[in-house]
Amino acid sequence: MAQKPLEGAQLAWMTVALAMATFMQVLDSTIANVAIPTIAGNLGSSNSQGTWVITSFGVANAISIPITGWLAKRIGEVRLFLWSTALFALASWLCGISNSLGMLIFFRVIQGLVAGPLIPLSQSLLLNNYPPAKRSMALALWSMTVIVAPIFGPILGGYISDNYHWGWIFFINIPIGLFVILVAMATLKGRETKTEIKPIDTVGLVLLIVGIGSLQVMLDQGKELDWFNSTEIIVLTVVAVVALVFLVVWELTDDHPVVDLSLFKSRNFTIGCLCISLAYMLYFGSIVLLPQLLQEVYGYTATWAGLASAPIGLLPVLLSPIIGKFGNRLDMRRLVTFSFVMYAVCFYWRAYTFEPGMDFGASAWPQFIQGFAIACFFMPLITITLSGLPPERMAAASSLSNFTRTLAGSIGTSITTTLWTQRESQHHSQLAEFVNPYSPQSQEMYRQLEQVGMSKQQASAYIANEITAQGLIISANEIFWLAAGVFLILLALVWVAKPPFSSGGGGGGGGAH
């Protein structure tokens, strides 16, 4: 941008507005998850049908994120941000008043489409309007909202669905959206980016919609339909692969691509995207797995499972401003290295301590300590990713990097939940082999259970439940071990990035120096 960076109260209010927009969008991607049984029951549908409330949003959102850079070039970043926020608030209201599942799914598609530009543009507008010396602080504050929102989403969603009409899951976006619009209009007035009318890449757009849409539906519905034992999943996979291969070829040869894949010619952009995506895949998979484990094995309610996960957000809130202030004095690769080491430590910690009879603290403490890893994760990796890019490419780079991160989160969720289920089945079979009428240990176990008043059938049911719980814990611990190992491998990848690193953006600091 040619404009002078914002300062003082105007800068502070802009930061709050952009952070709230990010928080609102990320929150909405997880808040409905725990409320699906309530929503489905209220609308006269099954839980499996209700999952389309999540899938529809995810598919539409995944399609719209990568075209944000192209839209911003045509419309302008500020104008696109304001329209996206307004339409998101409107779509939220329409979701809340829906009286059928089909109506709700339709408006969730609209909501997902208009939500796509919010995160990339909030990041781009922050960087382009902050003084160069304070851009690390801007990224740190922005990162805080991306991390905290998915943790509080299930807690808030569970509380609302337990105590109020489920529509309030969506209605809460309306006052936030209005606040964001009013503040953004006041602080970003006259700061519109340069627009450029380019031909519409119709072929690329169609390939993107078909490829990403098929891939996202496949990831969301794969477990429900038993993956590749389902014809539907096989067809979706083939369509996604073919469309995405053609998309890459087309976009690399088209004069006006809808997705600027040439960004991957930058070593730092490629390394940054890989590290963010793979790490976020592991992180997001774990925050989906942990509440399910606590509810299914340890009998936690949805609210208490959310509270056990919530400590992960405490340290980032405290440390992000400090890291943002002093982080630019350090080699960003060192901060990321510390983050990945702490991630590995916490995953190993869980693998060692998760066992039957585990108390609340055993699950909450690793979450709390993992906050160190998260605080040193987003800001330095985004800085590496965007370093050396000119201001006019910031929106496209931000949208593409956020798309890879979002897609990685979906992949992480699918892989984690599928592995957990499949490994549990294997461990259940192995453990059940030790329980048979001829085993002295089994006979003793039945005798002890019958002594406390259980019938033979009750004792068998109790033992079967214990075997299932053991299988779920063992399979979860295997996933934790695997995640820790991948984080240690990622340590080497981040050092392929090449300094110097700047926080991106315009005005005197946008490129490599």
Model-based region annotation:
Residues V34, P66-I67, L121, I151, ...:
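Residue-level hotspots within transmembrane alpha-helices of multi-pass secondary transporters
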Residues L182-T202, V249-V258, E355-P356, Q426, ...:
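Helix-loop junctions on the cytosolic side of multi-pass membrane transporters
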Residues I65-G204:
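Helix-loop-helix hairpins in multi-pass membrane proteins, especially solute transporters
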Residues S143, I151-F152, S286, S363-Q441:
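Small-residue-rich alpha-helical segments with characteristic i,i+4
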Residues A9, Q49, F179, R405-P499, ...:
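Hydrophobic transmembrane architecture of multi-pass small-molecule transporters
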Residues A9-K73, V78-S84, S92, G96, ...:
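Transmembrane core module of solute transporters
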Residues P37, S161-D162, D220, P291, ...:
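Juxtamembrane/transmembrane-helix interface segments of polytopic membrane transporters
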Residues P175-T193, V210-Q221, V239-T253, L491-K498:
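C-terminal membrane-cytosol helix-exit motif in multi-pass small-molecule transporters
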